Amino acid sequence: MAVVEQALAFKDPEGHRVSGILAFPPSHTDRVAILCHGFLSNKNSTTNKVLSTLLLERGIATFRFDFFGQGESEGPFEQITVSLAVKEALAALNFVASKGYRRIGLVGSSFGGLVALLAASEWPALSCLALKCPVPDFPEMLELEFGQHGMAEWKTTGTIPDVTGGPGRVKLQYGFYEDCARHLGYDAAKVITAPTLIVQGDRDEYVPLHQSRRLYDALQSEKRLEILAGADHRFSRPEDLRRMTTILADWMVQHLPAERPEPGRVDDAGASTPA
Protein backbone atom coordinates (compact mmCIF):
# COMPACT_ATOMS: atom_id res chain seq x y z
CA MET A 1 0.00 0.00 0.00
CA ALA A 2 1.37 3.39 -1.03
CA VAL A 3 1.18 5.65 2.02
CA VAL A 4 2.20 9.30 1.86
CA GLU A 5 3.48 11.15 4.94
CA GLN A 6 3.84 14.91 4.93
CA ALA A 7 5.56 16.96 7.63
CA LEU A 8 3.39 19.96 8.46
CA ALA A 9 3.30 22.65 11.11
CA PHE A 10 0.68 25.00 12.49
CA LYS A 11 0.55 27.69 15.15
CA ASP A 12 -1.24 27.30 18.45
CA PRO A 13 -3.32 30.27 19.72
CA GLU A 14 -0.28 31.62 21.58
CA GLY A 15 1.86 31.63 18.45
CA HIS A 16 4.01 28.58 19.14
CA ARG A 17 4.98 26.38 16.20
CA VAL A 18 3.47 22.89 16.51
CA SER A 19 5.07 20.11 14.47
CA GLY A 20 2.96 17.36 12.95
CA ILE A 21 2.84 14.58 10.36
CA LEU A 22 -0.16 14.01 8.12
CA ALA A 23 -0.33 10.49 6.69
CA PHE A 24 -2.93 9.44 4.17
CA PRO A 25 -3.78 6.39 2.06
CA PRO A 26 -3.78 6.46 -1.75
CA SER A 27 -7.56 6.60 -2.06
CA HIS A 28 -9.63 9.72 -1.48
CA THR A 29 -10.87 10.15 2.07
CA ASP A 30 -12.42 12.85 4.21
CA ARG A 31 -11.76 10.73 7.31
CA VAL A 32 -8.88 11.45 9.67
CA ALA A 33 -7.83 10.47 13.19
CA ILE A 34 -5.80 12.96 15.23
CA LEU A 35 -3.34 11.23 17.58
CA CYS A 36 -2.37 12.90 20.89
CA HIS A 37 0.73 11.44 22.55
CA GLY A 38 1.45 11.01 26.24
CA PHE A 39 3.50 12.91 28.82
CA LEU A 40 7.23 13.22 27.99
CA SER A 41 6.60 11.49 24.68
CA ASN A 42 6.23 12.68 21.09
CA LYS A 43 4.25 12.23 17.90
CA ASN A 44 6.30 9.18 16.89
CA SER A 45 5.45 7.11 19.96
CA THR A 46 5.03 3.38 19.47
CA THR A 47 1.26 3.60 19.94
CA ASN A 48 0.93 6.43 17.43
CA LYS A 49 3.00 4.70 14.74
CA VAL A 50 1.34 1.30 15.11
CA LEU A 51 -2.14 2.84 15.25
CA SER A 52 -1.41 5.05 12.26
CA THR A 53 -0.42 2.00 10.21
CA LEU A 54 -3.60 0.15 11.19
CA LEU A 55 -5.82 3.09 10.29
CA LEU A 56 -4.10 3.81 6.99
CA GLU A 57 -4.56 0.17 5.99
CA ARG A 58 -8.28 0.72 6.48
CA GLY A 59 -8.46 3.94 4.51
CA ILE A 60 -8.35 6.51 7.34
CA ALA A 61 -5.79 9.34 7.28
CA THR A 62 -3.93 10.21 10.48
CA PHE A 63 -2.45 13.39 11.90
CA ARG A 64 -0.01 13.10 14.77
CA PHE A 65 1.61 16.13 16.38
CA ASP A 66 3.97 17.11 19.18
CA PHE A 67 2.70 19.00 22.19
CA PHE A 68 4.48 22.16 23.36
CA GLY A 69 8.12 21.55 24.29
CA GLN A 70 8.11 17.94 23.13
CA GLY A 71 9.39 16.33 19.95
CA GLU A 72 9.91 19.02 17.31
CA SER A 73 7.41 21.57 18.62
CA GLU A 74 8.52 24.93 20.00
CA GLY A 75 8.81 25.82 23.64
CA PRO A 76 10.58 24.74 26.83
CA PHE A 77 8.87 21.62 28.19
CA GLU A 78 8.99 23.02 31.73
CA GLN A 79 6.27 25.54 30.77
CA ILE A 80 3.74 22.99 29.46
CA THR A 81 0.24 23.08 30.97
CA VAL A 82 -2.96 21.17 30.35
CA SER A 83 -4.58 24.45 29.33
CA LEU A 84 -2.01 25.00 26.58
CA ALA A 85 -2.14 21.38 25.42
CA VAL A 86 -5.93 21.59 25.03
CA LYS A 87 -5.52 24.76 22.95
CA GLU A 88 -3.08 22.87 20.73
CA ALA A 89 -5.43 19.91 20.32
CA LEU A 90 -8.25 22.27 19.32
CA ALA A 91 -5.86 24.01 16.90
CA ALA A 92 -5.04 20.59 15.41
CA LEU A 93 -8.76 19.92 14.93
CA ASN A 94 -9.15 23.24 13.14
CA PHE A 95 -6.03 22.53 11.10
CA VAL A 96 -7.21 19.19 9.69
CA ALA A 97 -10.67 20.64 9.06
CA SER A 98 -9.00 23.36 6.99
CA LYS A 99 -7.38 20.60 4.92
CA GLY A 100 -10.79 19.31 3.85
CA TYR A 101 -11.31 16.52 6.37
CA ARG A 102 -14.92 16.39 7.51
CA ARG A 103 -15.15 13.22 9.58
CA ILE A 104 -12.67 13.56 12.40
CA GLY A 105 -11.78 11.19 15.22
CA LEU A 106 -9.57 12.02 18.19
CA VAL A 107 -7.26 9.57 20.00
CA GLY A 108 -5.37 10.35 23.19
CA SER A 109 -2.86 8.40 25.28
CA SER A 110 -2.49 9.01 29.04
CA PHE A 111 -1.83 12.79 29.37
CA GLY A 112 -2.95 13.04 25.75
CA GLY A 113 -6.10 11.20 26.79
CA LEU A 114 -6.99 13.93 29.27
CA VAL A 115 -6.22 16.57 26.64
CA ALA A 116 -8.33 14.78 24.01
CA LEU A 117 -11.18 14.41 26.49
CA LEU A 118 -11.17 18.12 27.32
CA ALA A 119 -10.85 19.13 23.66
CA ALA A 120 -13.74 16.83 22.70
CA SER A 121 -15.97 18.63 25.21
CA GLU A 122 -15.36 21.85 23.24
CA TRP A 123 -15.73 20.31 19.76
CA PRO A 124 -19.30 19.04 19.32
CA ALA A 125 -18.73 18.14 15.65
CA LEU A 126 -16.23 15.41 16.61
CA SER A 127 -17.18 12.05 15.10
CA CYS A 128 -15.60 9.82 17.75
CA LEU A 129 -13.16 9.73 20.64
CA ALA A 130 -10.78 6.96 21.79
CA LEU A 131 -8.81 7.18 25.03
CA LYS A 132 -5.90 4.94 25.99
CA CYS A 133 -5.35 4.90 29.79
CA PRO A 134 -6.56 8.52 30.13
CA VAL A 135 -5.91 10.53 33.30
CA PRO A 136 -9.12 12.47 34.04
CA ASP A 137 -7.76 13.36 37.49
CA PHE A 138 -4.12 14.22 36.83
CA PRO A 139 -3.54 15.78 40.27
CA GLU A 140 -4.50 12.53 41.98
CA MET A 141 -2.11 10.54 39.81
CA LEU A 142 0.74 12.96 40.51
CA GLU A 143 0.11 12.89 44.25
CA LEU A 144 0.05 9.09 44.29
CA GLU A 145 3.18 8.83 42.15
CA PHE A 146 5.33 11.40 43.96
CA GLY A 147 3.97 11.27 47.51
CA GLN A 148 3.85 14.17 49.94
CA HIS A 149 7.64 14.57 50.06
CA GLY A 150 7.97 14.42 46.28
CA MET A 151 5.26 17.03 45.79
CA ALA A 152 7.01 19.35 48.25
CA GLU A 153 10.33 18.81 46.46
CA TRP A 154 8.67 19.62 43.13
CA LYS A 155 7.28 22.87 44.52
CA THR A 156 10.70 23.82 45.90
CA THR A 157 12.95 22.79 43.01
CA GLY A 158 10.71 23.04 39.94
CA THR A 159 11.73 19.51 38.95
CA ILE A 160 10.11 16.07 38.97
CA PRO A 161 11.49 12.53 38.66
CA ASP A 162 11.79 11.31 35.09
CA VAL A 163 8.61 9.23 34.84
CA THR A 164 9.92 7.57 31.68
CA GLY A 165 12.47 5.75 33.83
CA GLY A 166 15.53 7.93 33.36
CA PRO A 167 17.93 8.52 36.28
CA GLY A 168 17.70 12.31 36.41
CA ARG A 169 15.03 14.87 37.15
CA VAL A 170 12.99 16.84 34.62
CA LYS A 171 12.31 20.57 34.79
CA LEU A 172 8.58 21.25 35.13
CA GLN A 173 6.99 24.26 36.75
CA TYR A 174 4.78 23.51 39.75
CA GLY A 175 2.14 25.55 37.96
CA PHE A 176 1.52 22.44 35.85
CA TYR A 177 0.01 20.75 38.91
CA GLU A 178 -2.01 23.84 39.82
CA ASP A 179 -3.32 24.07 36.26
CA CYS A 180 -4.23 20.36 36.29
CA ALA A 181 -6.43 20.95 39.31
CA ARG A 182 -8.57 23.27 37.18
CA HIS A 183 -9.01 20.65 34.46
CA LEU A 184 -10.55 17.47 35.81
CA GLY A 185 -12.09 15.38 33.07
CA TYR A 186 -15.25 14.12 34.75
CA ASP A 187 -17.36 17.24 34.21
CA ALA A 188 -16.10 17.58 30.64
CA ALA A 189 -17.21 14.00 29.97
CA LYS A 190 -20.81 14.88 30.73
CA VAL A 191 -21.10 17.20 27.72
CA ILE A 192 -19.29 15.05 25.15
CA THR A 193 -21.62 13.84 22.40
CA ALA A 194 -19.13 11.78 20.37
CA PRO A 195 -19.04 7.99 20.85
CA THR A 196 -16.22 7.39 23.34
CA LEU A 197 -13.95 4.39 23.96
CA ILE A 198 -11.72 3.93 27.01
CA VAL A 199 -8.97 1.26 27.04
CA GLN A 200 -6.78 0.55 30.06
CA GLY A 201 -4.74 -2.34 31.44
CA ASP A 202 -5.66 -3.77 34.82
CA ARG A 203 -1.97 -3.61 35.82
CA ASP A 204 -1.55 0.06 35.01
CA GLU A 205 1.11 1.23 37.46
CA TYR A 206 0.40 4.95 37.04
CA VAL A 207 -3.29 5.66 36.45
CA PRO A 208 -5.73 4.21 39.03
CA LEU A 209 -8.37 2.02 37.40
CA HIS A 210 -11.12 3.78 39.32
CA GLN A 211 -10.47 6.89 37.22
CA SER A 212 -11.47 5.10 34.01
CA ARG A 213 -14.52 3.59 35.68
CA ARG A 214 -15.65 6.95 37.04
CA LEU A 215 -15.01 8.55 33.66
CA TYR A 216 -17.09 5.87 31.96
CA ASP A 217 -19.95 6.52 34.38
CA ALA A 218 -19.78 10.27 33.68
CA LEU A 219 -20.05 9.88 29.91
CA GLN A 220 -23.54 10.42 28.52
CA SER A 221 -22.81 9.49 24.89
CA GLU A 222 -22.38 6.06 23.33
CA LYS A 223 -19.50 4.56 25.28
CA ARG A 224 -17.37 1.47 25.83
CA LEU A 225 -14.83 0.55 28.51
CA GLU A 226 -12.21 -2.14 27.82
CA ILE A 227 -10.03 -3.32 30.70
CA LEU A 228 -7.24 -5.55 29.36
CA ALA A 229 -6.11 -8.27 31.75
CA GLY A 230 -2.40 -8.23 32.52
CA ALA A 231 -1.60 -5.04 30.59
CA ASP A 232 0.50 -2.28 32.18
CA HIS A 233 0.39 1.46 31.49
CA ARG A 234 2.63 1.25 28.43
CA PHE A 235 1.13 -2.01 27.11
CA SER A 236 4.69 -3.31 27.16
CA ARG A 237 4.00 -6.87 26.04
CA PRO A 238 3.65 -7.20 22.25
CA GLU A 239 0.32 -8.98 22.59
CA ASP A 240 -1.06 -6.18 24.78
CA LEU A 241 0.12 -3.49 22.35
CA ARG A 242 -1.42 -5.39 19.45
CA ARG A 243 -4.75 -5.87 21.19
CA MET A 244 -4.94 -2.27 22.45
CA THR A 245 -4.14 -0.69 19.09
CA THR A 246 -6.56 -3.03 17.31
CA ILE A 247 -9.37 -2.03 19.68
CA LEU A 248 -8.61 1.66 19.11
CA ALA A 249 -8.46 1.21 15.33
CA ASP A 250 -11.70 -0.77 15.25
CA TRP A 251 -13.48 2.01 17.16
CA MET A 252 -12.28 4.62 14.68
CA VAL A 253 -13.32 2.48 11.71
CA GLN A 254 -16.73 1.79 13.23
CA HIS A 255 -17.48 5.46 13.81
CA LEU A 256 -15.76 6.84 10.73
CA PRO A 257 -17.47 4.55 8.20
CA ALA A 258 -15.98 4.20 4.74
CA GLU A 259 -17.39 5.90 1.70
CA ARG A 260 -17.38 4.17 -1.67
CA PRO A 261 -13.65 3.80 -2.52
CA GLU A 262 -12.26 5.72 -5.45
CA PRO A 263 -8.75 6.36 -6.81
CA GLY A 264 -7.08 9.42 -5.38
CA ARG A 265 -4.19 11.80 -5.55
CA VAL A 266 -2.65 14.26 -3.15
CA ASP A 267 -3.51 17.91 -3.64
CA ASP A 268 -1.51 20.91 -2.47
CA ALA A 269 -3.49 21.15 0.77
CA GLY A 270 -2.33 17.73 1.85
CA ALA A 271 -5.68 15.91 1.82
CA SER A 272 -6.45 13.09 -0.57
CA THR A 273 -8.80 14.14 -3.35
CA PRO A 274 -10.39 12.36 -6.31
CA ALA A 275 -8.31 12.17 -9.46
PLM feature spans:
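Short beta-strand/loop motif that positions the catalytic acidic residue
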Residues: V191-T193, I198-Q200, D204
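Short alpha-helix in the alpha/beta-hydrolase fold that links the catalytic acid
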Residues: N48, G185, A194, P208-D217
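N-terminal cap/lid segment of alpha/beta-hydrolase-fold proteins
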Residues: M1-H28
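The serine-hydrolase catalytic nucleophile loop
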Residues: L40-S52, F67, H210
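Catalytic nucleophile-loop/oxyanion-hole region of alpha/beta-hydrolase
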Residues: G71-Y101
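Hydrolase active-site cap/lid region
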Residues: P124-G175
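Conserved alpha/beta-hydrolase
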Residues: S52-E74
